[in-house]
């Protein structure tokens, strides 16, 4: 799976970078988590700082175009992102961490 960054837009007010990227894959469309891990490795970031919002694969193509938000640290991601996006990306919210520890 090869990831090419198409566009990066800085958003300093929300402490993040909006990234549009293209994934070329050999098999079926890769999972959101595998794309997140690969994108994080490409950008030299921690996987919890990357939130994949959209993956779009055209029928019959081996190319997926996606949109992600890359935060400066995981705390900003938890503060800004909606709960369902955190769940999709397997990022644990603050309240859930305390519940799991108990």
Swiss-Prot record:
Disulfide bonds: none
Annotated GO biological process: translation
Cross-referenced PROSITE patterns: RIBOSOMAL_S24E
Entry keyword set: Ribonucleoprotein, Ribosomal protein
Entry GO terms, CC: ribonucleoprotein complex; ribosome
GO molecular-function term, one example from the UniProt record: structural constituent of ribosome
Record's keyword annotation contains Lipid metabolism: no
Family, as annotated: Belongs to the eukaryotic ribosomal protein eS24 family.
Protein name: Small ribosomal subunit protein eS24
Originating organism: Haloarcula marismortui (strain ATCC 43049 / DSM 3752 / JCM 8966 / VKM B-1809) (Halobacterium marismortui)
